[in-house]
Amino acid sequence: MDILHAVFLALIQGITEFLPISSSAHLILPKELFGWEDQGLAFDVAVHVGTLSAVILYFRKDIVNLIAGWFGSITGKQSENGSLAWCIIVATVPAGLFGLLLGNFIEEHLRSVSVIATTTVVFGLLLWFADAKHSETKQLAQMTLFIALVIGLAQALAMIPGTSRSGITITAALLLGFGRSDAARFSFLLSIPIITLSGGYMGLKLLEESNVNWQEIGVGVLVSAISAYICIHYFLSFINKIGMLPFVIYRLLLGAGLFALVWFA
């Protein structure tokens, strides 16, 4: 993989990781349209490190408060940050278990273009329904362990390619009564442990490889981190004004394009 390919793929990962449009749907397109080779495990780890760095940097103050609140809750001092930290932990469990139990099956059987096209469209329509019907009756401070578990179960569905982790968690939060901004904020905070687990798992597998292109890795980390940070900032700035409809329309067009690849291949 040359540097131009690395920049392009890292840019795709950085932008699509946090927008509700599915990163896997976009990463499969260069392979199908241009015949590009698979980016490889090392590059996957690199872009995970990049996107993780971006979300940690953006929410650094929140993370410090969440950690302090969590430690405080252990010593018996209750706080909103402590409760939210426990909610994030609980919401992470379903996806972790789902990945351990079904990760290999999904990799072997559900990474086809037809599956990604279907999930891109179906979950895009579900996002539209949730956004149209959301009532904004809850704030993030009202998050409970049960609600977090439901959102976590939704996040587990994102193991299926094309679903979009941010898309399905925002959808679930909207359906449960949260506003767009709070739904997106919780989704992004929830991404931190799940990206850490996923990147850590791939990192362990990477130890078995001997041929690693460090230039590609550097490009992957840097480009994905910068693009992801910018994406998070503008998404949170404009989501209450523009809503989810632009992303729904985009998903429908993308799904149609993927179906066209299947039908005319």
Curated annotation (Swiss-Prot):
Coiled coil: none annotated. It is found in: Cell inner membrane. GO terms for cellular component: plasma membrane. Its main location: membrane. One of its GO terms (molecular function) is undecaprenyl-diphosphatase activity. It catalyses: di-trans,octa-cis-undecaprenyl diphosphate + H2O = di-trans,octa-cis-undecaprenyl phosphate + phosphate + H(+). It is a multi-pass membrane protein. InterPro entries: UppP (IPR003824). The keyword Nucleus does not apply. It comes from the Bacteria. Signal peptide: none annotated. The keyword Magnesium does not apply. Keywords: Antibiotic resistance, Cell inner membrane, Cell membrane, Cell shape, Cell wall biogenesis/degradation, Hydrolase, Membrane, Peptidoglycan synthesis, Transmembrane, Transmembrane helix. GO terms for biological process: cell wall organization; peptidoglycan biosynthetic process; regulation of cell shape; response to antibiotic. It is an enzyme of class 3 (hydrolase). Its EC number is 3.6.1.27. The chain crosses the membrane at residues 1-21, 39-59, 86-106, 112-132, 140-160, 186-206, 219-239, 244-264. Catalyzes the dephosphorylation of undecaprenyl diphosphate (UPP). Confers resistance to bacitracin. NCBIfam families: PRK00281.2-4 (NF001393), undec_PP_bacA (TIGR00753). Belongs to the UppP family. Bacitracin is thought to be involved in the inhibition of peptidoglycan synthesis by sequestering undecaprenyl diphosphate, thereby reducing the pool of lipid carrier available. This is Undecaprenyl-diphosphatase. It comes from Saccharophagus degradans (strain 2-40 / ATCC 43961 / DSM 17024). The gene is uppP.
